[in-house]
């Protein structure tokens, strides 16, 4: 494949094991430490990359307060081998934060404003709860329905609009856990999970190299017993069909194609297009549809050209309508989230965009795909998408 010098390539990707936010493996690890450990280890395994060449560390994080405050990108960067002369910024596009971090780095590379970037994101939802310090403007209800800020209710709305049944949602959730467990057992996550110290349920310190969030014993029967989590009367969305509240971080090394070539590196993929889009906040989960349509148009592709897809599983009731309208629902088992998704692995807000993108690149590498799409919905009505081509 012939690459242009300013094409944007992904050199490597790593992530932490995903930990449960309630009493999980990361309960005694701070978000900055988690991020710094991950960045350091990813750089260590790419010895041809001089940390001094890093132009900027761009880190996604949603709730930027407590240990995640004061520009956590810089806080983490200072605790790594990256010199103080490299810059760092923290970005937030809610659920799409670390994918936005990737886009920001890509746009800088394309315009000649740097050659080497470290991007990713973190969210420690056990230490900094999703609503900590949040004070929504009461006047917002004049412009958008109050329930638009309640993600579970927006999923209920989207599922109802598209005729998604409780049974379909439960089956989707079981699939997520089964595929994530299968990927774990078969070593499919080995290249992406960076082992970390953590604490087991008995309080013993150990090395984790697997996601503790996956529940392989999940069944249709066990999910059917759960009560609706957001709309007690007539709702279909349960805790079992929603993304898990978890702690985790993800990291990528992103470069210009020319710099990667100069260093003798073999990239995982090149970015072919990027897009963001807005939708009515009441159906925030629909955002991946217009974002994907824009990204495909910019890449000169259509859905039939896409070999593999990673769609963030915010809710089964949200993911299924998106797949339906992208015309890939009937191809889900061949193309979509082949290693499970956020229902099994969790959705640490600031981490997820780079996480699903990196997992996608590994799926493409393991299965020989050419084009891949990573996309996700974003709270308050947005979507974000990236199209990759395997190098």
Curated annotation (Swiss-Prot):
Pathway listed: Lipid metabolism; fatty acid beta-oxidation
InterPro entries per UniProt: FadA (IPR012805), Thiolase (IPR002155), Thiolase-like (IPR016039), Thiolase-like_sf_Thiolase (IPR050215), Thiolase_acyl_enz_int_AS (IPR020615), Thiolase_AS (IPR020610), Thiolase_C (IPR020617), Thiolase_CS (IPR020613)
Keyword Acyltransferase: yes
Recorded coiled-coil stretches: none
A single Gene Ontology CC term: cytoplasm
Assembly information from the UniProt record: Heterotetramer of two alpha chains (FadB) and two beta chains (FadA).
Function field: Catalyzes the final step of fatty acid oxidation in which acetyl-CoA is released and the CoA ester of a fatty acid two carbons shorter is formed.
Stated name of the protein: 3-ketoacyl-CoA thiolase
Organism: Pseudomonas fragi
Lineage of producing organism: Bacteria, Pseudomonadati, Pseudomonadota, Gammaproteobacteria, Pseudomonadales
Gene name as annotated: fadA
């Amino acid at each position: 494949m012939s690459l242009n010098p300013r094409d944007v390539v992904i050199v490597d990707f790593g992530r932490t094991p995903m930990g449960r936010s309630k009493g999980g493996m990361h309960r005694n690890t701070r978000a900055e430490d988690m991020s710094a450990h991950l960045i350091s280890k990813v750089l260590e395994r790419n010895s041809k990359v001089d940390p001094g060449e890093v132009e900027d560390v761009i880190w996604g994080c949603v709730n930027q307060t407590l240990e995640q405050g004061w520009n956590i990108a810089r806080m983490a960067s200072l605790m790594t081998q990256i010199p103080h002369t490299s810059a760092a910024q923290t970005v937030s596009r809610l659920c799409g934060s670390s994918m936005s971090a990737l886009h920001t780095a890509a746009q800088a590379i394309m315009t000649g404003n740097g050659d080497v970037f470290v991007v990713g994101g973190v969210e420690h939802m056990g230490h900094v709860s999703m609503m900590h310090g949040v004070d929504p403007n009461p006047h917002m209800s004049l412009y958008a329905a109050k329930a638009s800020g309640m993600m579970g209710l927006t999923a209920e709305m989207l599922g109802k609009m598209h005729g998604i049944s409780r049974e379909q949602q439960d089956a989707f959730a079981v699939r997520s856990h089964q595929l994530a467990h299968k990927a774990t057992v078969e070593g499919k996550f080995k290249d992406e999970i960076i082992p970390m110290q953590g604490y087991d349920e008995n309080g013993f310190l150990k090395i984790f190299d697997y996601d503790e969030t996956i529940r392989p014993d999940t069944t249709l029967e066990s999910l059917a017993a759960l009560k609706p989590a957001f709309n007690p009367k007539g709702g279909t969305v349960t805790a079992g069909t929603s993304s898990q509240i978890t702690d985790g971080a993800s990291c990528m090394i992103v470069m210009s194609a020319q710099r990667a070539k100069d260093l003798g590196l073999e990239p995982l993929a090149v970015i072919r297009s990027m897009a963001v889009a807005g939708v009515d906040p009441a159906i925030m989960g629909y955002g991946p549809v217009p974002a994907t349509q824009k990204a495909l148009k910019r890449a000169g592709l259509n859905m039939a050209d896409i070999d593999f897809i990673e769609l963030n599983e915010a809710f089964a009731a949200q993911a299924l309508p998106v797949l339906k309208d992208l015309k890939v629902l009937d191809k889900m088992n061949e193309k979509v989230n082949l290693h499970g998704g956020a229902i099994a692995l969790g959705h640490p807000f600031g981490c997820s965009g780079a996480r699903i993108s990196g997992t996608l690149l590994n799926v493409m590498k393991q299965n020989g795909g050419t084009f891949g799409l990573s996309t996700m919905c974003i709270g308050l009505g947005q979507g974000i998408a990236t199209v990759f081509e395997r190098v």
